[in-house]
Amino acid sequence: MKISLSLIALFIAAAILFGCSTDDIPTQLTALVMQQANVTCSEISFYLDPALGGAYECETVPESSSSDIPTYYVFIYPSHTELTIQKYPLTQTQFPPQIWIYPVSRFSELLPDVLPQRVSDLRNLVTGGTWGSGELPFLPAIPQVQSFFIHETVMTFNGGIGVRFITEYSEAPTPISNKNIIYTFQGLTDDGKYWVAVTLPISSPILPAENDMLPEGYTEESLLLNYNSYVNDVIGALEAQDPDSFFPTINSLDTFEGSITVGQ
């Protein structure tokens, strides 16, 4: 399915103007029984269930901030830890199963007009259920729009707190599919030193595998013009599903997130 540049521009403009719904805010604080860690990578350790992965790759990503890099903030970040889970049960998805650990202080120095506000939004979200934009806070920064979020819940990990939700990112008004949706956790350590970002592919039995087919009853133009209505219908259908119908289950991914320890 092809989308014209003019339709993409209209989609992005509409997303900026209207954003995602903020009627439902995460108010439930969930603390999980922590499994003993069996993976350590730099300053992070956690329990990796064999059902979620059989190996991992640990990398220290060097800082990207030189003057010859475009100033757009997607290309600017501090040295940080990046862990990729291997042999994850879902493959060929938009996001790989990964964890990022960002040092907040250095990141804020590099992006003083972006990061402090994002950190403030996340803190306000987990403490009071409010934030400064239609999108829930998310790292790593990507040049796409957060199409929706569901199952948003404030959760703890060992030494920190954050928000878990299921979402999708898109650069155009494309159909929502299992190729694109992710479970994500965005949190801060209690001492404020680190931002913990987790992205894990997830799938629902009611979504198509790919996003290359128009939803029934839609044309490219009608999907753009009625995209908010389409997204709301998908949100309603997904929220009506039993959490255990997702794969991997939300509970199994929550258990994974709850086992994370940073810098201890």
Identify the residue ranges that each predicted region occupies.
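Signature of long, low-cysteine stretches enriched in small and polar/charged residues
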Residues: G128-K193, T199-P208
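Positively charged n-region of N-terminal signal peptides that target proteins for export
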Residues: M1-S6
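C-terminal motif of bacterial Sec signal peptides marking the signal peptidase cleavage site
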Residues: L17-G19
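Bacterial signal peptide processing site
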Residues: S21-D23
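Surface-exposed amphipathic alpha-helical segments
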Residues: L32-I44, V198-Q264
